[in-house]
């Protein structure tokens, strides 16, 4: 009882001593970080985001994002805050902001905007999350939750297992805002977009595109609606707010800029880049590094820039594939042991489909008491200057079947020589001029787009297949269409 009372007093003291004024509302609210700490958190988290997803190399598009972002930041409620804008090389349709002024757009979401005003509306929405300190507020709530778990863990041993709440970096990406925060960011998005001369009603039209795409995440990044739940009256509210702000700014013109935006994204990569790896018929191919290996049935593969993970559905079988550090087997083995607090049980040299390899059985130095033991196997494969590493981990009653599945994957690692797969290129957005009046479906047929992709392309263009389009209108199609 004394410990519980102490916890209540401690939390109350924190609540009383850490209130800060919200820059947007002017109200005081619980905030466990100062603005300087907020900026520091964003700066420390940014490298993790960049390392995980990569940055799109497109200087012209980046310059456009910087220009529009800085212009909008100046009319925001935190105009003195240094903002940073980046384009992530991810096909997932998302935009998000970290505390401290770090705003990210994926190439996936840029491909789905159909005019500059849609982009500006979402830009204002994300800047709104920063100016209203939504991310910092969510992070503060997590810190309070972590405090509660840490103190509670001295009472309950079982609770201790769940006390490892991740702090910065990728954890921030998966924070889910509430509908109240989303409504406020919609309001701020309309305000900021209107003040910079954009027709903010276009933002509502883009949210309809997001609805058609759905809110599910793809792999390691959530989609927009997964972390930005839609307020129930979003479309009507954005329209009403747009009218209010346009009346407040009678001397301002409000632009859409459709054609100029579409020309900016011409040749933008679309979808997954096959050169960085793709799965086809339960085989993972990596053309850039010229290898492939089979994927166990019903296991989930996630391909990130730094590693590939293959996970069994129960979560008790995990295969990690990446580039090892070290110039030889022993150096790579030592780095693996040191980095993961593991010990060597035994090792042996072997060959895998012509490659020199080493296999080692490992164990944890200090396994968690009361948990099922792990079986850990390391496989190192030498390929010229590259040292590939498989780390196979299994736990529970199904260790034998998990290990068998992972062994089949490792034993199937082979040199990729198929020219068609080696030369597979990323699909790209192509901006074309409509040749004749007709339905959008007819336009897609004119440009020989596969019928199986018509619905996808309608969403990409913010249209219905039955919509009428006029000759010379600009639309998006896809080049380098992957084989069906």
PLM features: what roles do these ranges have?
Residues 1-19:
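Sec-dependent bacterial lipoprotein signal peptides
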Residues 19-287, 292, 305-307, 311-316, ...:
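A Zn2+-metalloprotease active-site environment signal
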Residues 40, 183, 294, 464, ...:
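Residue-level recognition of short, solvent-exposed, well-ordered loop/turn junctions
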Residues 120, 245, 301, 390-428:
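Surface-exposed amphipathic alpha-helical segments
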Residues 181, 421-451:
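Primarily a LysM-type cell-wall glycan-binding module
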Residues 336-386:
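Signature of long, low-cysteine stretches enriched in small and polar/charged residues
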Residues 396-400, 450, 463-466:
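Short solvent-exposed coil/turn linkers within tandem alpha-helical repeat scaffolds
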Residues 453-484:
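Extracellular LysM carbohydrate-binding repeats and other cell-envelope/extracellular binding modules
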């Amino acid at each position: 009882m004394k410990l519980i009372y102490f916890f209540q007093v401690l939390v109350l003291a924190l609540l009383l001593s850490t209130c800060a004024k919200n820059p947007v509302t002017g109200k005081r609210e619980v905030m466990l970080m100062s603005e300087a700490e907020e900026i520091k958190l964003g700066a420390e988290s940014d490298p993790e985001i960049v390392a995980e997803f990569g940055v799109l190399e497109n200087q012209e598009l980046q310059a456009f994002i910087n220009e529009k972002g800085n212009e909008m930041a100046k009319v925001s409620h935190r105009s003195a805050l240094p903002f940073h804008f980046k384009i992530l090389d991810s096909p997932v349709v998302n935009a998000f902001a970290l505390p401290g002024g770090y705003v990210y757009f994926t190439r996936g979401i840029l491909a789905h905007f159909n005019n500059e005003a849609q982009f500006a509306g979402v830009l204002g929405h994300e800047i709104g999350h920063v100016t209203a300190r939504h991310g910092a507020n969510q992070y503060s709530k997590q810190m309070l939750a972590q405090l509660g778990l840490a103190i509670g863990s001295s009472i309950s041993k079982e609770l201790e297992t769940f006390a490892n709440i991740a702090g910065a970096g990728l954890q921030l990406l998966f924070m889910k805002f509430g509908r109240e925060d989303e409504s406020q960011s919609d309001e701020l998005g309309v305000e900021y977009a209107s003040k910079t001369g954009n027709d903010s009603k276009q933002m509502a039209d883009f949210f309809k595109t997001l609805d058609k795409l759905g809110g599910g995440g793809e792999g390691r990044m959530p989609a927009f609606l997964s972390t930005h739940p839609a307020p129930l009256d979003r479309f009507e509210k954005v329209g009403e707010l747009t009218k209010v702000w346009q009346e407040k700014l009678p001397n301002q013109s409000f632009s859409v800029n459709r054609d100029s935006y579409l020309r900016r994204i011409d040749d933008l990569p679309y979808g997954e880049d096959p050169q960085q790896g793709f799965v086809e018929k339960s085989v993972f191919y990596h053309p850039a590094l010229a290898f492939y290996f089979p994927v166990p049935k019903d296991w989930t593969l996630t391909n990130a820039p730094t590693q590939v993970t293959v996970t069994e559905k129960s979560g008790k079988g995990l295969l990690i594939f990446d580039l090892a550090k070290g110039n030889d087997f022993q150096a790579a083995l030592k780095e693996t042991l040191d980095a993961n607090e593991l010990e060597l049980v035994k090792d042996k040299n072997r060959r895998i489909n012509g490659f020199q390899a080493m296999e080692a059985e490992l164990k944890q130095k200090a396994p968690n008491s009361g948990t099922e033991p792990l079986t850990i196997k390391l496989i190192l494969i030498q390929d010229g200057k590259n040292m590939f590493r498989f780390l196979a981990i299994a736990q529970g009653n199904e260790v034998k079947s998990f290990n068998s599945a992972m062994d089949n994957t490792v034993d199937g690692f082979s040199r990729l020589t198929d020219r068609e797969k080696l030369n597979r290129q990323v699909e790209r957005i192509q901006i074309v001029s409509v040749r004749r009046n007709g339905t959008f479906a007819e336009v897609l047929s004119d440009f020989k787009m596969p019928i199986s992709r018509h619905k996808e392309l309608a969403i990409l263009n913010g249209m219905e297949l039955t919509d009428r389009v006029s000759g010379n209108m600009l639309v998006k199609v896809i080049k380098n269409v992957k084989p069906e």
